[in-house]
């Protein structure tokens, strides 16, 4: 998989991230902000420079290349225009390449044999979460925190990677966790995948929401995210279904 430039360089995000997905998203957002500040700053500097340099002064004649009615004279510097165009194209190409790399990172779950797979079913108006042991929760998603001691050689443990198989039981919905920077459409008859790794044990009330207008109860289509320690999640999981 292509690793984004900002990930290779460890570009920090503007705010602390709660998961690798959020960290990658924040890093790309920071990259866009830096590019926007540089380009915008350069434009404003040139704007005020030319405004001061070429302002009309009393007693000075109009320049020969000033615009006039009729045939335009040759103006400007084609070489400079070509250089600026090449720089802008390179900038936009780099941003686009990193955006596609981030999409690939978010849309393709890692090959983790110890990942937890959860079926997510949207309905009017709520979320149902079905675990591999057939246990179901409505309005609450429980996941294990990142467990660095869980390796592929260790069976019966969860690494912390959570893969969500998202669908809908009725109309179109859109499953999203803003804190983790993940969002996928929930479409009847189709399964879309999302994944994340939570790095901090905590309770995030109403962190899960529907991001597509789906009826009169759309605003109430929320769910809590509970990130449990490895032991607590294991104990809870074994009590199901």
How would you name each of these model-derived features?
Residues 25, 29-42:
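Alpha-helical transmembrane segments
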Residues 38-46, 87-94:
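Residue-level signal for the membrane-embedded core of alpha-helical transmembrane segments
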Residues 2-29, 51-241:
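Non-transmembrane, membrane-proximal soluble domains of secreted or membrane proteins
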